[in-house]
Amino acid sequence: MDKFIGKVGTVIVYLFLTANALLVLGPVIWTVLASFKVGNNLFSSSFTGIEFTLDHYRALFNDTPYFEWYKNTFFLATANMIISLVVVTLSAFIFSRYRFNGKRNIMMSILVLQMFPAFLSMTAIYILLSKMGLIDTYAGLLFVYVTGSLPFMIWLVKGYFDAIPTSLDEAAKIDGAGHMTIFLEIILPLAKPILVFVGLVSFTGPWMDFILPTLILRSEEKMTLAIGIFSWISSNSAENFTLFAAGSLLVAVPITLLFVATQKHITTGLVSGAVKE
């Protein structure tokens, strides 16, 4: 009887996982097929017997400034990744290894900042950037990206740094190493998994974002992929839905490859950074 119940439970679990996989992969498969489908109709009762083509991809590269959008987005994502890594690692190292007055209060303030959704501050962000003259600039957009992700990232990386034994620091100091040497040659190499996670998250944020670029950027030559593709499809309504599917697929491919290539580091970094030994 127990074996029967165990088998039934296993079947139920597999059915549940299969249903979830279909819910996740279904829209992806549909988008991939739609991007190769002849015609402009994204919706179809069936994909059987439908002719496929590469015309949508040709039109995307020939009729739109897609490479310009790609370049702008890549610049923003890369700049945000580099700046975030530098600021987050230095801040986390200071909070993890140094003792100073107000440290606890600062950490609690950072923790409280994580509780407020970014959408609550959209109006304040726009007014602030307008006063600073940063509307329609990449500097303004990067300012929002970097400062918005700092609270969560600092706490996460600090937790990982805390798990690195301080005895390594002390041994290095005995050998004559300074604080920066300890940071660069001991802490950072041991923190590679969490740094990969932070870098990837910092890169994918601007790459996939639509709301903030729409709020801040105004010039067509500064458009990102999300804004450019949306503007292109909305200009001719339903005529460009299959082209939109092709563009969306090309946006997702680099991120998917990055996640697959760094999956091991992401899992290790996230779990280790969340638990202090």
Segment roles from a protein language model:
Residues 2-277:
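A structural signal for multi-pass alpha-helical bundles of membrane permease subunits
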